[in-house]
A protein has these predicted regions:
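A detector for small-residue-rich transmembrane helices and their helix-helix packing motifs
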Residues: 2-162
Length: 162
């Protein structure tokens, strides 16, 4: 039992560390009663370009946090176990590239949360599943991306006609 737990922690160190970090940040916000929203990405704002490194750590609320926690654990676990040799690089690139995409292509509002990281991890598994001809892996990734899309859709505010 201890050996299995040690193996899981070793294989999933980066996803577990990331999930710990996002929960720690939310805990800090609650305890200190300080919002860290100034660490959001502000598209095309060169003064805040380093927020590419901080925005995935900030979440609006616990629903937002949970909706990113589960996919990171699942997708991170898949990548860590199937792509052991490159998993750390994949996670790091997903983290940084998602920030660059939001900074370069984002709209007019600041962006927070790890959804970009989730989509990047899922996209990596989806594409590599097709390239390696592993349809189960590709379909699992597609399912997680699809389900996460509906979580994202719930965050978007839509004006209703009265």
């Amino acid at each position: 039992m201890k050996k299995n737990l040690s193996h899981i922690i070793n294989v999933m160190f980066i996803p577990i560390l990331f999930v710990f970090a996002i929960w720690f940040v939310k805990g800090y916000e609650l305890i200190s009663e300080n919002s860290l929203s100034e660490l959001a990405i502000h598209p095309w704002d060169t003064e805040k370009i380093l927020n590419i490194l901080t925005f995935p750590l900030i979440h609006a609320d616990f629903s937002h946090l949970l909706n990113n926690t589960y996919p990171i654990i699942i997708l991170g676990g898949i990548i860590s176990s199937v792509y052991k040799e490159i998993s750390n690089r994949v996670f790091l690139l997903s983290y940084v590239l998602s920030g660059m995409v939001f900074w370069g292509l984002g709209g007019l509002t600041p962006v927070i949360g790890a959804s970009g990281v989730v989509y990047a991890l899922g996209s990596f598994i989806l594409v590599s599943g097709f390239i390696k001809k592993q349809p189960r892996l590709a379909m699992l990734s597609f399912l997680i991306i699809f389900l996460n899309f509906f979580n994202l859709w719930g965050i978007i505010e839509i004006e209703k006609d009265n």
